[in-house]
Amino acid sequence: MNINKNILFYLKHSHVQAWNFLSSHGRFLEKNVPGLKVSICLNSKEFLDRLPEAEVIVVWFFNADWLVKAPNLKFIFTPAAGNDWIKLDKSTVRVSNGRFHGPMIAESIIGAIFYFLKAFHFSKKCNYRKNGPG
């Protein structure tokens, strides 16, 4: 199957390197999805300059006023868990947000519950004072 789609990526974060879409990610997608062409924007100016031709974008956020600059836009994908960073009322553009966060959040909550149930915070404090086991 040949996709024949150009996808515009603007996934940059100044503080969390893992949240950045790198050229190696783009090469991986192009290699494994026949016909896919990946374009990566490194800043908002570059993204807004390329937006008029885009049909599919992958972004952390999208401002509603950018929609007038995107006459060909059909899909917005975001890895973000919620939809609060992309607000499009009554738009023909389909928005799809990340749905993979559930297990990670559940594991974090269970870890926090066990931390307090097993009194790890108290044990740690005792160990610092040399009052506890260890």
Q: Can you say where each PLM-predicted feature lies in the sequence?
A:
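Phosphate/diphosphate ligand-binding glycine-rich loop within oxidoreductases
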Residues: 55-128
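N-terminal glycine-/charge-rich "phosphate-binding" loop or analogous flexible N-terminal tail
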Residues: 1-54
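A short, basic/flexible loop-to-alpha-helix module at the beginning of a structural domain
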Residues: 130-134
